[in-house]
Regions:
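Extracytoplasmic/secreted proteins, especially bacterial periplasmic and envelope-associated proteins
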Residues: 3-4, 40, 47, 51, ...
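A structural motif corresponding to the C-terminal end of an alpha-helix
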Residues: 4-18, 48-68
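Structured, solvent-exposed acidic/aromatic patches
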Residues: 7, 18, 22-25, 29-35
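Structural recognition of the beta-strand scaffold that forms the well-ordered cores
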Residues: 10, 16-21, 66-69, 136, ...
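Mobile gating loops/cap/lid regions near enzyme active sites that modulate substrate access
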Residues: 30-43, 47, 58-141
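Terminal and linker regions of secretory-pathway proteins
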Residues: 129, 145-165
Length: 165
């Protein structure tokens, strides 16, 4: 990834480049389930994310790139969800059973990409009572629209702090 940023983005003249790490996979609903079954495997998920961050930062040392710590942003939001308008940070908003029905059984794992499986009918795969704006996770690993908004709000603050906006 750092090689791509150096060789394909910076080398071609990009002036405003920000790199994000990945949030801690163990902090997601699926990661929490893995931790409950096997703390060793759950810890490996965190190590994976930390290693990615290390390699990415190391590969960009000395480059004109601003670093955005998505892992820290997610940790902050998950530590005080109400401050960010979230009412649920443990259960995915998308309902795997509904998505399986909507896709004719083609999608059975609840992957958020298919939460809106019916064209023209937004978010038809939501769990009863779920709100994609106040439930942080869409599926076991990915943020909901509200989760991504929280991330983008924090990224925007950092871009302003960099003087880019």
């Amino acid at each position: 990834m750092s090689g791509y940023i150096r060789n394909e983005i910076l080398a071609k003249g990009a002036k405003y480049v920000a790199a994000l790490n990945i949030p801690d996979p163990a902090a997601t609903p699926e990661g929490a389930a893995v931790m409950a079954m096997s703390p060793v495997v759950g810890a490996a998920l965190t190590t994976f994310a930390d290693t990615f961050k290390l390699w990415l930062r190391e590969g960009l040392t000395g480059q004109p790139v601003q670093w955005i710590d998505a892992k820290a942003i997610f940790a902050t939001v998950l530590a005080d969800p109400a401050a960010y308008g979230f009412t649920n940070i443990t259960v995915p908003a998308c309902d795997a059973e509904k998505m399986a029905l909507l896709t004719g059984g083609l999608v059975t794992d609840g992957f958020a990409l298919f939460c809106n499986a019916t064209p023209g009918s937004p978010l038809t795969g939501l769990r009863v009572g779920a709100d994609a704006d106040t439930w942080f996770f869409a599926d076991g690993n990915h943020p909901s629209t509200g989760g991504f908004k929280a991330l983008s709000d924090e990224v925007l603050k950092q871009l302003k702090a960099f003087g880019w906006i």
